[in-house]
């Protein structure tokens, strides 16, 4: 009898964690969509600042081809110079995975493709990892990795 009770408690606890993770996944998916909507329109007034607001001022951004960026200001300047009005990012459907980080936030991983603005060419695909921190009710990315860049065949 005790064994069955312990098993039931384990199943219920696992179900509670899954429900919590479902809510967390929905939150991070919404943040991802909002952040990259601003990224995709960063050539429009106010959108680059909106995109920047999703990142901690001391963001560490690791890009397999571009190297490491150590601050939000430098990352945003590079985005403005090389991305805005030229490329848009699309999340690969079904690829987003979110895991909680106790007393901090979440880790999001997935795949994304990059398409030329004004055309249908989506030539690049890569993997990403975003470390999201929740502090004082505000979610921000503290670390970002974009890697495994390759042709999207």
Predicted regions and their residues:
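A solvent-exposed, acidic/Ser-Thr-rich amphipathic alpha-helical stretch
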Residues: 26, 46-104, 113
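Sec-dependent signal peptide recognition
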Residues: 2-8
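Short, surface-exposed coil-to-beta transition loops
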Residues: 91-93, 109, 122-128, 142
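Repetitive helical segments and hydrophobic/amphipathic motifs
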Residues: 12-13
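Short, low-complexity N-terminal intrinsically disordered segments enriched in polar/charged residues
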Residues: 5, 16-57, 153
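Short beta-strand edge/turn micro-motifs at domain boundaries
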Residues: 125-152
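Short beta-strand segments that buttress and anchor functional surface loops
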Residues: 109-116
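A short, structured loop/turn motif at beta-sheet edges
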Residues: 98-106, 132-138
């Amino acid at each position: 009898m005790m064994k069955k009770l312990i098993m039931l408690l384990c199943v219920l606890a696992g179900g509670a964690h899954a429900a919590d993770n479902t809510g967390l996944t929905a939150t991070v998916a919404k943040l991802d969509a909002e952040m990259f909507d601003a990224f995709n329109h960063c050539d429009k007034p106010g959108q680059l600042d909106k995109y920047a607001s999703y990142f901690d001022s001391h963001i560490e951004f690791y890009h397999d081809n571009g190297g490491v960026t150590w601050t939000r200001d430098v990352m945003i300047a590079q985005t403005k110079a090389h991305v805005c009005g030229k490329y848009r990012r699309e999340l690969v459907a079904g690829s987003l995975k979110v895991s909680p980080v106790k007393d901090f936030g979440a880790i999001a991983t997935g795949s994304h493709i990059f398409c030329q603005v004004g055309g249908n060419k989506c030539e690049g695909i890569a993997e990403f990892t975003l470390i999201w921190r929740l502090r004082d009710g505000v979610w921000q990315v503290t670390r970002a990795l974009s890697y495994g860049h390759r042709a999207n065949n």
